[in-house]
Structures are given as structure tokens and as C-alpha cells.
Regions:
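Alpha-helical interface subdomain recognition
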Residues: 1-80, 101-104, 113, 117, ...
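Short Ser/Thr-interspersed hydrophobic loop/turn segments at strand-loop and sheet-helix junctions
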Residues: 51, 75-78, 177-181, 206
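Short glycine/proline-enriched turns and hinge-like loops at secondary-structure junctions
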Residues: 66, 132-135, 154-158
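A short, Trp-centered hydrophobic/proline-enriched beta-strand micro-motif
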Residues: 116-128
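A short core secondary-structure module
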Residues: 124, 148-184
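A structural signal for short hydrophobic beta-strand segments in well-ordered beta-sheet cores
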Residues: 138-140
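Internal glycine-rich alpha/beta core junctions
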Residues: 192-218, 367
């Protein structure tokens, strides 16, 4: 990833903040807290003031306009430390949906609170057990909003929800509603990696409590947001995989068996080289996808799927190999290696597994 001087300086600043305030130990602390706790809200406010929430936002709207490569670099820093933040749920998905799907008046009204960290939002769009973004049954009926949504990331911490729903004409729509509105029931749970998700049930939520997102083309805007979220998640996975690879190589240099460093064993050298080559291949795909979002005339769907599919495979390979190369202690909770492995399994399913992205990539290329 090649960043300009401003982007690199920003990445370094965020990395230093995360190392000091949100190291891997923060994830361990989170696991012991009530399930309603998704992340440290105060620390997220500090990250927002640092500029993390405004990286891709145009300067005219109060953003830094650093571009998607810069946001990808920040996501990699978060991935290196497994830092629990609402970057994906609130910034990329919710804030992105507001910017690309809403009217200028709605953007002007709601965006400032998201940029400065005063509010965090979540998007409720998944209704199936597996990623199926095109399936939609939640609808605005004469009685109100009715339906259910599962796997809403960081949903219990959200001040507002953006909900995909069919309007009374049966057309796709996106509406905004306060998370504590009567008729909204939620069940928070933790995933195997310690992160929070919420299943929401909407039972005749009054239409007067909801606000339809009124941009000129909200459905196509939401499709772009999903592609961007896939690439940013892939960047986070890449950061985790790179950290894991570096830790494992250091272990190979230090661990001794039969009075020699195990890194001198040719079989382990070949496996380490394989990890590194897959890491660089994934890096190239992620960079290409991020650059595509700042470009015209590029198939962003194909690039996002290539990045996510390769990140899935890379992170799973490196997490598996890291556990094996650490031996018996690799499966213990005391070692951070297992936390990365659990994160790899969760990320593999988020926003489409490898098979889903292989199919979409092939379809985009006409196969």
C-alpha cells in the first residue's frame, strides 16, 4: 500500500493511538463485559475527533477527503490490534449509506453528529442466516414497520438505525429510526470473536417515527456502500493476517527444538513463505479495490469481491498455520493467536463468504 505523506502520517497517528488505548487486551476486557457493550464509546469519540470518521468524506461536507486507501490503512491498523470499534458498522455502512443514499438536507442534518462521534448508527439489512443482501421481507405496512433483521453489527450501541425495507408500493427503501422507538425489540449476543451483534424485531413501528432516506437513487447508493464495506473489512482482515504472520515468524526465530531454532527447518520455512506470498497477493487485491472507489470506469463489484475472497482465504490460512506452528500453546486462550483465529472465522462469514464472492466475481466476468 503506497500512501502519500499526509495519509502515512495519519495512519501512524491512528496506529499509535490504538497501540496505547485499544491494544488486544481491550478485546479481552470487552469479552467480560455485559453483552450490550460493543466498544468503548469514549475512546471512539477520541478516534472520531482524530479524524477516523471523516477520512473519505468530502471536504465540503466537513471531512478530510483522504480517500479510500487511507481508510483502508486505518482498517489494517485496527485489524493488527483486533481493536473493537464501530468503523465498519457506523462509519462505512451507516455513515456511507447516509452520504450516498440520503438527500442533501438529510446529510446536512445528520452527518455532523456522526463525524464528531456524538452519535453512532448501525444498519439493519440482513434477514437470512447467510449473507443474502437482495432478500428483503421487512416492509412498511398500514400498521407500521414490520419484519426482522439479524446480524446487526454493534446494534445495541447504536443511537439510530438505518433499516432496509419495502415501502407501501413494494419498492426498495431505506429508513431512519431511533433505536429506542416503541415497537423495536432487540436481542444482543456475542460472536465467537467477542464482538457484538443484535437481532431486531420490528413490530408495527409507527411510520411517523421513521424517516425515509430520500436521495435520488438510494438502492444503487446502498449497493456501492456494500462494496466499500467488503473492501474495508478485507483491509481489516489483511491487517490481522499480517500481524499474525509477523508474530509467527518471530516465534519460528526464537523457539528451539532439538537444540536448534525451529525456523531452520525447511518444511516450516516453506510454509512461512507460502503465508507471506498469500499475504502479498491479498494486499494487492485490497489495494486495487480501494483505489477503484476513488476512480471511474472500474467494476467496483468485481474488485470488492476479489479483495474479500482473497482476504478470506489468506486470513484463514495464516490463522490455521499460526496455531499449528505455535504447537500446543497455540490453542490456549492465554496466547493471542487464538483470538486472531476466531476473528478470521467470523470475518469469513461477514459480508459474504469465499464461495459467495467467487460466484459474484465469476458472474461479473460473464461466466
Amino acid at each position: 500500500m503506497i500512501l502519500n505523506s499526509e495519509q502515512e502520517s495519519f495512519r501512524a497517528s491512528v496506529g499509535s493511538f490504538l497501540a496505547a488505548k485499544l491494544p488486544i487486551s481491550a478485546l479481552r476486557t470487552l469479552r467480560g463485559k455485559p453483552v450490550a457493550t460493543a466498544y468503548d464509546r469514549d475512546l471512539w469519540g477520541q478516534l472520531a475527533m482524530l479524524g477516523v470518521s471523516s477520512i473519505t468524506v468530502p471536504a465540503a461536507s466537513g471531512g478530510a477527503e483522504f480517500g479510500w486507501l487511507a481508510l483502508g490503512a486505518v482498517a489494517q491498523e485496527i485489524g493488527r490490534r483486533l481493536s473493537p470499534t464501530p468503523l465498519l458498522s457506523s462509519v462505512v455502512l451507516a455513515q456511507g449509506a447516509l452520504i450516498q443514499c440520503a438527500s442533501p438536507a438529510q446529510v446536512a442534518r445528520y452527518l455532523p453528529a456522526l463525524l464528531n462521534g456524538d452519535e453512532v448508527w448501525a444498519v439493519a439489512f440482513e434477514e437470512e442466516a447467510h449473507f443474502s443482501p437482495d432478500r428483503l421481507q421487512t416492509a412498511m405496512t398500514p400498521q407500521g414497520l414490520c419484519g426482522s433483521k439479524g446480524m446487526v453489527l454493534d446494534g445495541a450501541a447504536a443511537d439510530r438505525l438505518l433499516v432496509t425495507a419495502l415501502n407501501e408500493s413494494g419498492q426498495w427503501g431505506l429508513l431512519l429510526v431511533d433505536s429506542d422507538t416503541p415497537g423495536i425489540n432487540q436481542q444482543a449476543s456475542r460472536l465467537m470473536d467477542g464482538r457484538q451483534y443484535v437481532a431486531f424485531e420490528f413490530s408495527e413501528v409507527s411510520e411517523s417515527a421513521c424517516e425515509w432516506v430520500a436521495g435520488p437513487a438510494p438502492e444503487s447508493g446502498w449497493a456501492r456502500v456494500l462494496n466499500q464495506a467488503m473492501a474495508i473489512l478485507a483491509a481489516e482482515m489483511l491487517g490481522s493476517a499480517r500481524e499474525l504472520c509477523e508474530r509467527t515468524i518471530e516465534h519460528l526465530k526464537e523457539r528451539e527444538q532439538f537444540d536448534v531454532k525451529i525456523g531452520s527447518f525447511q518444511a516450516l520455512q516453506h510454509r512461512a513463505a507460502h503465508m507471506y506470498s498469500e499475504l502479498e497477493l491479498s494486499q494487492a487485491a485490497v489495494d486495487a479495490a480501494l483505489v477503484a472507489f476513488d476512480s471511474e470506469g472500474v467494476d467496483q463489484c468485481a474488485m470488492a469481491s476479489a479483495a474479500k475472497a482473497l482476504a478470506n482465504e489468506c486470513f484463514q490460512l495464516i490463522s490455521d498455520e499460526s496455531v499449528q506452528m505455535h504447537g500446543g500453546m497455540g490453542v490456549t486462550d492465554e496466547l493471542d493467536i487464538g483470538l486472531f483465529l476466531k476473528r478470521s472465522r467470523v470475518c469469513n462469514q461477514l459480508l459474504g463468504d469465499t464461495h459467495w464472492h467467487h460466484l459474484r466475481y465469476a458472474n461479473r466476468l460473464g461466466f
